[in-house]
Amino acid sequence: MNWSNPMGEKMGYCKPTFMNIPQEKREKILSVAVNEFAYNGFENANINTIAKKAEVSVGSLYKYFDTKTDLFLTSVDYALNNLEIIMETIVESDEDVMIKLEKLIRVAIEFSRRNTVLIKLYNEVTSESKAELVKKIAEHVESITSQAYKKAVIDGQVAGEIRTDIDPGMAAFFVDNLLMNIQFSYACDYYCERYKIYAGEDIFQKDEFAIENILRFIKAALKSNQ
């Protein structure tokens, strides 16, 4: 991920001082924070532990982030930014909707395999119980992708590729839920075991089989008969 440029509005949870330190140091702090939050959750993650593993002082961390929440949200950005960029690029292309969906499924599987800890953090985000933090996370994480998916559905309806008797927002919500579940099923222990129970012990060696069946399911639900 390129952190050489200042964070935009979407990545606005760190202090300017964080962007003034070397990129390698920023990467180390956030990599450590991602692991700590992914495996311990927001409440149990320890700032002292993060500082120690990142080889910075606790005081320095608070020079970079006002609160633990700000560090958490910046870590979420760090974890999901690359995936969001890839998915948005696919969604905003001029390709047919079903081609876009196939690419999104492939990206979800490949990214989850290569970035298990990042997806574990995403899973932790979705199970957070602190109401104020949940609202902030949902608005922060879902706002861009929800609009991109909704636009893709509307464009598909206009082009006659997607049936028009389905609300675009609901269709986008269901597609995003499916993609999110795919990511968890290739990275998070419980979801992996659940996936094997439903699809067979060898499902992780049958990517094309999985992609084909997921697409068949989506097409049956969304594809226009025109």
Name what the model sees in each region.
Residues 1-13, 147, 151-159, 177, ...:
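C-terminal peripheral helix-coil segments that are non-catalytic and often amphipathic
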Residues 74, 88-117, 168-175, 208:
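Hydrophobic alpha-helical connector segments
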Residues 109-148, 170-172, 200-204:
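Short secondary-structure transition hinges
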Residues 25-33, 50, 75-83, 149:
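Generic hydrophobic, amphipathic alpha-helix propensity
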Residues 32-36, 111:
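Short amphipathic alpha-helical elements of helix-turn-helix/winged-helix folds
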Residues 81-84, 88-89, 132-161, 169-173, ...:
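Amphipathic alpha-helical packing segments from all-alpha helical-bundle domains
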Residues 28, 36-70, 74:
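Helix-turn-helix
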